[in-house]
Amino acid sequence: MLGSIACSMEFEDFDLYSYFYGLVKQIPEGYVTTYGDLAQALGDPIAARAVGYMLSINEDPDTIPCYRVVLHDGTVGNYTHPLGPMEKVRRLRADGIPVVDGMIENFDRYRFRDFKTDQPLRKMQQYQEYIARKYSESGAGEFRTVAAFDVSYEERRAFASMVIQDGSTIEAYVISDGINFPYIPGYLAFREFRFIKKLYRKADLLLIDGNGILHPRFAGLATHAGVLLDRASIGVAKHLTRSTRHQDIIYMQDRPVGVMIRKNMIVSPGNFIDVNGSADTVRKMWNDRYPWPLKLAHQLSTRHAETGGRVSEYSIESAHELH
DNA sequence: GCGACAG
DNA sequence: ATCTTGTCGC
Ligand SMILES: [Mg+2]
């Protein structure tokens, strides 16, 4: 029964930006809060930097009072404005907050933390635990068709690509759509999975830029996608995080979850494959020490982001050249 | 003070 | 990821 509840809430359309700006509006005039307190109200203190980022791209500073968000040590912090933090100080003083030398006097007295929130990131963590339970390490081991995915970004727009190899045939697809979730460490799947789902065509293996079970809750983007699309999947990341390494094997809480197959290339199983199988599979499909479908997907999405998505036909021919 | 924080 | 308003632990 709990499983069926989880199935009905994949969070793909959840707009964290709107939810977040709603929280910022709760800060009363004459009070301040911190980036960390807002992150806690979202459900996880690790989101503090994402809070700063979302404030920085706020398009409506007249109704969303960014300037009431300050650093944990009582200094006012940054502000995107021609006048910079000076303008932040001016607005705080206009609210009656005493600021001396960029520091709020009697900080505790003015601090607001009583947000009305249901901490959405907590429910998302629970959903990740459900995804992790669905991971299976056994599968076919041989894959005829491979689909590789990557996503590039502007502030509120994403350009996502998929490159499919079926024997000697290569097809490439690009889509563009708005973004409803910022990058938050540990929550990448809630930002990127919906683009992968939209692009997805039947393939035996999904190759994904990010981690699989190499994740604090064993449910990185590649596992999230593999489980929800019921496909074999592998995560390929450039940076190692939140784990320990002995030789080239990566561990999380003493469980092997990935392999460093070279500097700046970490492979972890997403679904229907194990740690060694995922590393062997990626090693078989690289060209110049990089799995070529992923490289192509990366180039496709970045190129489309740079040109604003205008028809810059980066075509099948160049795909063949790279292969 | 410096590094960690998947993209 | 892009070029950017954090926080915590060592
Ligand atoms: Mg990427």
UniProtKB/Swiss-Prot annotation:
GO terms for biological process: DNA repair; methylation. This is Bifunctional methyltransferase/endonuclease. The keyword GTP-binding does not apply. It comes from the Archaea. Residues 92-323 are annotated as: Endonuclease V. Gene3D superfamilies: archaeoglobus fulgidus dsm 4304 superfamily (3.30.2170.10), Winged helix-like DNA-binding domain superfamily/Winged helix DNA-binding domain (1.10.10.10). Pfam families: DNA_binding_1, Endonuclease_5. It catalyses: Endonucleolytic cleavage at apurinic or apyrimidinic sites to products with a 5'-phosphate. InterPro entries: Endonuclease-V, MethylDNA_cys_MeTrfase_DNA-bd, MethylDNA_cys_MeTrfase_DNAb, WH-like_DNA-bd_sf. Its cofactor is Mg(2+). One of its GO terms (cellular component) is cytoplasm. The record marks 183 as: Interaction with target DNA. The keyword Nuclease applies. It is found in: Cytoplasm. In the N-terminal section; belongs to the MGMT family. In the C-terminal section; belongs to the endonuclease V family. It comes from Thermoplasma acidophilum (strain ATCC 25905 / DSM 1728 / JCM 9062 / NBRC 15155 / AMRC-C165). DNA repair enzyme involved in the repair of deaminated bases. Selectively cleaves double-stranded DNA at the second phosphodiester bond 3' to a deoxyinosine leaving behind the intact lesion on the nicked DNA. GO terms for molecular function: deoxyribonuclease V activity; metal ion binding; methyltransferase activity; RNA endonuclease activity, producing 5'-phosphomonoesters; single-stranded RNA binding. Its EC number is 2.1.1.-, 3.1.21.7. Mg(2+) binds at residues 150, 209. Keywords: Cytoplasm, DNA damage, DNA repair, Endonuclease, Hydrolase, Magnesium, Metal-binding, Methyltransferase, Multifunctional enzyme, Nuclease, Transferase.
